[in-house]
């Protein structure tokens, strides 16, 4: 989500006594907002409590636990993005990075680019293609252009996103000539 906030709903507790149900509330902080594994750097906002509906007789006693001194890690995983593109029919199944016109579903409207060689469609014919009948080949995500909304490719993945690609009809040109004969045909 492009923040260093680790929401309580994203954190799992381990090492509690078997059968005891605990929950966390509020949020903690990581040292980075980018993809990776981090130590949770600030636990001051996290509160341990008995799980909703638990009672002292069920053994869920939050007062018996502390986060101080434990091991606290948090992983930020890559986010799936969607790509789409269009080109005119050219008799090949090739999809070039330059043919990808939209990369969507990024966080905070971050901008990414495409790079690499070619992907392919299952046919060279005019049609709409999707993840099922395309291959990424060597197409990869690349960092977006420098600026306020530059996205880092390392934070995103094409896996799990949609990949839509359309081959449109090729526009033909025509010309002709004839000797003047006063006819319109």
Predicted segment positions?
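Short loop/turn motifs that initiate or flank beta-strands
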Residues: 2-185
């Amino acid at each position: 989500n492009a923040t260093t906030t680790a929401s309580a709903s994203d954190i799992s507790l381990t090492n509690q006594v078997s059968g005891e149900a605990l929950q966390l509330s509020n949020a903690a902080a990581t040292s980075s907002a980018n993809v990776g594994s981090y130590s949770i750097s600030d636990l001051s906002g996290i509160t341990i409590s008995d799980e909703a509906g638990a009672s002292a007789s069920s053994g869920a006693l939050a007062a018996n636990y502390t986060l101080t001194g434990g091991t606290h890690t948090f992983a930020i995983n890559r986010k799936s993005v969607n790509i789409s593109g269009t080109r005119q029919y050219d008799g090949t199944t090739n999809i070039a990075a330059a043919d990808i016109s939209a990369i969507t579903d990024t966080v905070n409207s971050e901008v990414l680019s495409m790079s690499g060689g070619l992907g392919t469609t299952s046919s060279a014919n005019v049609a709409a293609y999707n993840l099922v009948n395309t291959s990424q080949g060597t197409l990869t995500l690349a960092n977006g252009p420098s600026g306020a909304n530059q996205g880092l490719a390392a934070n995103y993945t094409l896996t799990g996103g949609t990949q839509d690609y359309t081959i449109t009809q090729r526009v033909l040109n025509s010309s002709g000539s004839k000797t003047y004969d006063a006819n319109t045909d």
